[in-house]
Amino acid sequence: MASTTPNFDAIVIGAGFSGMYMLKSLRDSLGLNVRVFEAGGTVGGTWYWNRYPGARCDSDSYIYCFTFDKQLLQEWEWSERYPEQPEIMRYLEHVAHRHDLKRDMQFNTRVTGAEFDESTDAWAVHTDRGDLVTARYLIAAVGSLSHTNMPAFKGLETFTGTWYHTSRFPQAGVDFTGKRVGVVGTGATAVQAIPEIAQQAKHLTVFQRTANYCVPARNGKVDPEVVKARKADYDGVVRRIRESFFGQEHYFIPKSVLETTPEERE
């Protein structure tokens, strides 16, 4: 390296929930000079990439949010128990604007490599746009839900129809009206997408290798009185989810399933 003074105190890879929080904490709480590199066109992480029909959160909305802004916890109103992708994106964009996070973010930029130089005690970070920047700290907030798992199907390159991958769905959406559609897989993503596509498609075929266990979502509007009670006890909510094994207000039933009757198990 030509200089022993890093360009930044810290570089964060990714601008999803974790990357946004890291920037907020390092910059505003610790006073560090931070740069975030994000491959997508804006904040959101997995919610930026996964915009397939029916994409929504599977955690209760009142805990699927940042807790560092207590005023925002009181102000923000979620429309459903499990909000859809567009609503989550609106929330993340609002947080980014409210806390001026984007001024320290560089979008449409993918980190391609990083090396630690022991002689200068700094990281050298390379991007696909030709950047070479240095930092004392490097934080990978890349997540685990946005990398495309593209199946190696024979003949995919010569298929004359149109095909899509749920993690790279067109931003403008797709109109399946009158179409014959095939969906490969019945995992968590397909469970959300299939019912939505079925409402439009002329014919839908689902290809399933292994059956997966699903529970009813029981989604819907949240009782205003329940919302009011949660907002009045957000400190308690945060404490309980941090103490919970699941990170949510759900707990183990302290007995074996074999101790229950068949009716209870159902």
Task: Place the predicted regions along the sequence by residue.
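Feature captures the FAD/FMN-dependent oxidoreductase FAD-binding
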Residues: 78-145
